[in-house]
């Protein structure tokens, strides 16, 4: 679609450092009726870029959440239903960052359905990270809650997910409800890149995942439980 930008990807299926659970996406339609359309969109590595212009330099910013908002307004008008997902590194880790408060507000206002945290979110530090995740989930007049999904951000001792591992979204297509499952996987490299105090008490792969791979997290753990 010509109007789409590089920062906004439209996918026939979701692979968001994650796995798309089986879902019946087909919708029966009369021969003379166009089939309803579901658009699934992803962004990632936005790094706290909120505006079309850098507030310090005044230079144009090609990849920003303000641009996403405009693009999604057009995309939502062109499809019958839409999911909007972010694969993480959404926040600014610079010297003047605000702990992700502005990014959380932007994600909610734009109408993101879920975020899969990447290393950037964990660079905030434990307290600011938890505040950012909580701010995403707030229900307020500032926008709808955004789900934080991670099936490999785990408690060190219990190996239970610290956030919801997955979500099954239901969208209406024509006269059918279509269920789409999204499992979040990300930030597996966090222990190697961050201070120990930032990842104390948590782990980013199940103990049996000796290869340290995202594919194992799906095939070796989640596929059996969600299949």
Region roles according to the model:
Residues 14-23:
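Bacterial N-terminal signal peptides
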Residues 26-30:
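Sec/Tat signal peptide C-region and signal peptidase I cleavage site
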Residues 24-25, 224:
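Low-complexity, intrinsically disordered tandem-repeat tracts enriched in small/polar residues
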Residues 31-227:
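Acidic, metal/ion-coordinating pockets
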Residues 3-15:
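Bacterial N-terminal signal peptides that target proteins for export
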């Amino acid at each position: 679609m010509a109007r789409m930008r590089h920062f906004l990807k439209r996918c026939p299926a979701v692979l968001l450092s994650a796995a798309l659970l089986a879902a019946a996406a087909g919708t029966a339609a009369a021969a003379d009726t166009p089939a309803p359309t579901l658009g699934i969109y992803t962004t990632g590595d936005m790094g706290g870029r909120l505006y079309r212009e850098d507030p310090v330099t005044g230079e144009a910013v090609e990849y920003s959440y303000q641009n996403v908002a405009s693009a999604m307004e057009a995309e939502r008008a062109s499809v019958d239903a839409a999911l909007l997902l972010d694969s993480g590194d959404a926040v600014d880790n610079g010297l003047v960052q605000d702990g992700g408060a502005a990014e959380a507000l932007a994600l909610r206002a734009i109408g993101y359905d879920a975020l899969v945290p990447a290393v950037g979110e964990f660079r905030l530090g434990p307290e600011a990270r938890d505040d950012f995740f909580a701010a995403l989930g707030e229900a307020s007049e500032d926008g709808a809650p955004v789900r934080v999904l991670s099936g490999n951000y785990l408690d060190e001792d219990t190996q239970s997910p610290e956030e919801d591992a997955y979500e099954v979204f239901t969208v209406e297509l024509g006269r059918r409800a279509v269920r789409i499952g999204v499992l979040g996987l990300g930030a597996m490299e966090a222990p190697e890149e961050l201070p120990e105090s930032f990842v104390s008490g948590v782990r980013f792969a199940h103990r049996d995942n000796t290869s340290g791979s995202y594919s194992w997290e799906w095939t070796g753990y989640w596929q059996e439980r969600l299949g």
